[in-house]
Protein backbone atom coordinates (compact mmCIF):
# COMPACT_ATOMS: atom_id res chain seq x y z
CA UNK A 1 0.00 0.00 0.00
CA UNK A 2 1.35 3.42 -0.94
CA UNK A 3 1.66 6.21 1.59
CA UNK A 4 -0.63 9.22 1.75
CA UNK A 5 0.36 12.10 -0.51
CA UNK A 6 -0.20 14.83 2.09
CA UNK A 7 2.69 14.88 4.57
CA UNK A 8 2.08 18.07 6.59
CA UNK A 9 4.97 20.42 7.31
CA UNK A 10 4.47 23.95 8.65
CA UNK A 11 7.66 25.24 7.07
CA UNK A 12 6.85 23.89 3.61
CA UNK A 13 3.28 25.13 3.90
CA UNK A 14 4.37 28.68 4.76
CA UNK A 15 7.13 28.81 2.16
CA UNK A 16 4.77 28.00 -0.67
CA UNK A 17 1.47 29.51 0.48
CA UNK A 18 2.45 32.06 3.14
CA UNK A 19 1.58 35.73 3.25
CA UNK A 20 5.08 36.92 2.35
CA UNK A 21 5.20 34.67 -0.70
CA UNK A 22 1.76 35.84 -1.83
CA UNK A 23 2.59 39.52 -1.44
CA UNK A 24 5.81 39.15 -3.43
CA UNK A 25 4.23 38.63 -6.86
CA UNK A 26 1.62 40.54 -8.87
CA UNK A 27 -0.67 37.50 -9.00
CA UNK A 28 -0.16 36.79 -5.31
CA UNK A 29 -1.19 40.35 -4.51
CA UNK A 30 -4.30 39.82 -6.63
CA UNK A 31 -5.16 36.78 -4.53
CA UNK A 32 -4.79 38.80 -1.32
CA UNK A 33 -6.89 41.60 -2.80
CA UNK A 34 -9.67 39.19 -3.76
CA UNK A 35 -9.66 37.55 -0.34
CA UNK A 36 -9.79 40.96 1.39
CA UNK A 37 -12.69 42.02 -0.83
CA UNK A 38 -14.51 38.80 -0.05
CA UNK A 39 -13.96 39.39 3.67
CA UNK A 40 -11.88 36.31 4.41
CA UNK A 41 -10.73 36.02 8.01
CA UNK A 42 -7.46 34.40 6.87
CA UNK A 43 -5.77 35.87 3.81
CA UNK A 44 -2.99 33.32 3.51
CA UNK A 45 -2.37 29.92 5.13
From Swiss-Prot:
Pfam families: Ribosomal_L34 (PF00468)
Annotated region (Disordered), positions in chain: 1-45
Keywords from the named record: Ribonucleoprotein, Ribosomal protein
Domain of life: Bacteria
GO biological process: translation
Ranges that cross the membrane: none
InterPro entries: Ribosomal_bL34 (IPR000271)
Bias type Basic residues, positions: 32-45
MF terms in GO: structural constituent of ribosome
One GO CC term on file: ribosome
HAMAP family in the record: Ribosomal_bL34
PANTHER family recorded: LARGE RIBOSOMAL SUBUNIT PROTEIN BL34M, MITOCHONDRIAL RIBOSOMAL PROTEIN 34 FAMILY MEMBER
Family that this chain belongs to: Belongs to the bacterial ribosomal protein bL34 family.
Protein name: Large ribosomal subunit protein bL34
